[in-house]
UniProtKB/Swiss-Prot annotation:
Disruption phenotype: No visible phenotype under normal growth conditions, but mutant plants have reduced lignin content and increased sugar extractability. Mutant plants show enhanced susceptibility to the bacterial blight pathogen Xanthomomas oryzae pv. oryzae (Xoo). Pfam families: 3Beta_HSD. This is Cinnamoyl-CoA reductase-like SNL6. The gene is SNL6. The active site is at residue 226. Involved in defense response. Required for NPR1/NH1-mediated resistance to the bacterial blight pathogen Xanthomomas oryzae pv. oryzae (Xoo). Required for pathogenesis-related (PR) genes expression. May be involved in lignin biosynthesis. Belongs to the 3-beta-HSD family. Its EC number is 1.2.-.-. GO terms for biological process: defense response to bacterium; lignin biosynthetic process; steroid biosynthetic process. It is an enzyme of class 1 (oxidoreductase). One of its GO terms (molecular function) is oxidoreductase activity, acting on the CH-OH group of donors, NAD or NADP as acceptor. InterPro entries: 3Beta_OHSteriod_DH/Estase, NAD(P)-bd_dom_sf, NAD(P)_dehydrat-like. Keywords: Lignin biosynthesis, NADP, Oxidoreductase, Plant defense.
Length: 379
């Protein structure tokens, strides 16, 4: 969802995106061009297309929703490095304006990037955007920059509805065979904690789901939205002619994440002290998250990837690390909160996060197939 902002704010974000892109390729226009992102000549517009009219259709053509977001932008960048042709599904004129100001694209999709306007709650526009693509990366999410936490109960409901529309559009579009869905680690970690209930797993892995009632009762709207959206996606894909994989990243960090991903980050950190105490607060570099998306997508082609994948780089264990996260995001740190965080650092964590499934996939593709696309259980 787009939000009107000041020209100065938008320009600062554009410059950060441009710098991050060039830095990722080693700097310089030549490096960007070699990877498929080229500076445009003069004031060339970003091309707007509709459905199959734009971008060469084929097995290396994919569509990315939310491609101008922090994660979506990194996924597009990584896809181009892997030789894919990408359609960016944009929702607002502001998103299109950002791309124009970046001047990183050539005309008529010559750089491997095309754009199409698509509303993730409108199945017809999604169908047109996906037509001719072999796969879809659904990275878009709803945020409410006017909200105190960056995310509201209404946003959670919208995200679940959008997930259903995206999957239905994928199923309806004949060319689409695979979908990589961006969820969150928060869809795995929030449950009512019964200290004496030995049935509750110590290891938190892809088999664990957050309890929607618990999230609702504690107003953990971001976690609720991600959990409900992912469950909705799995229900919609079950028994259909579509391969679905979900990536569940931890708090996504990286260059400029305070400006470019602040609302989602602040929403993610609601309840962070409890996660810190339980050993469940983790971070993931945006580059790691993007690479995970592409790697699972490619592994889906030979049935060596399926189900859910938890993605993180680092588990935050010390109060000092948590304080630094808050500082980077500009979150006021109250004395009581600081004391609570300090106390949590003195207690052993009750849970262990597990990322072995993704680690195995990222380390090698030469392994036996053991995943089942429709074995995800949450009911």
């Amino acid at each position: 969802m787009g939000v009107l902002r000041s020209t100065q704010s938008m320009q600062a974000e554009v410059e950060e995106m441009r710098a991050a892109l060039l830095h990722g390729h080693g700097g310089g226009a030549a490096a960007a061009a070699a990877a498929g992102w080229r500076p445009s000549a003069g004031d060339a517009d970003v091309k707007r297309t509709a459905g199959g009219d734009g971008g060469a259709a084929g097995p290396r053509t994919v569509c990315v929703t939310g491609g101008i977001s922090f994660v979506g932008f990194a996924v597009v960048d990584r896809l181009l490095r892997h030789g894919y042709t990408v359609r960016l599904a944009l929702e607002t004129q502001e998103d299109l304006d950002k791309l124009r100001e970046m001047e990183m694209f050539g005309e008529d999709g010559r750089d491997g990037v095309w754009t199409v306007m698509a509303n993730v709650t409108d199945p017809e526009s999604l169908h047109r955007a996906f037509d001719g693509c072999a796969g879809v990366f659904h990275t878009s999410a709803f945020v409410d920059p006017g909200g105190m936490s960056g995310y509201t109960k209404h946003m959670a409901s919208l995200e679940a509805k959008a997930a259903e529309q995206v999957i239905e559009a994928c199923v309806r579009t004949e060319s689409v065979r695979k979908c990589v869905f961006t969820s969150s680690l928060l869809a795995c970690v929030w449950r009512q904690n019964y200290p004496h209930d030995r049935r509750f797993p110590t290891i938190i892995d892809e088999n664990c789901w957050s309890d929607e009632s618990f999230c609702r009762d504690n107003k953990l709207w971001f976690a609720l939205g991600k959990t409900a959206a992912e469950k909705t996606a799995w229900r919609a894909a079950r028994g259909r002619d579509l391969k679905l994989v979900t990536v569940c990243p931890a708090l996504v960090t990286g260059p400029g994440f305070r400006r470019r991903n602040s609302t989602a980050s602040i929403a993610y950190l609601k309840g962070a002290r409890a996660m810190l105490a339980d050993g469940l607060l983790a971070t993931a570099s945006v580059e790691t998250v993007a690479e995970a998306h592409v790697r699972v997508y490619e592994a889906m082609g030979d049935n060596t990837a399926g189900g859910r994948y938890i993605c993180y780089d680092h588990v935050v264990k010390r109060p000092e690390e948590f304080a630094e996260l808050e500082r980077q995001l500009g979150i006021p740190r109250r004395a009581a909160a600081a004391a609570a965080a300090q106390d949590s650092g003195d207690r052993p964590a009750r849970f262990d996060l597990c990322r072995q499934k993704l680690a195995r996939l990222m380390s090698t593709r030469r392994r036996c197939t053991y995943d089942d696309y429709y074995s995800v259980a949450f009911d």
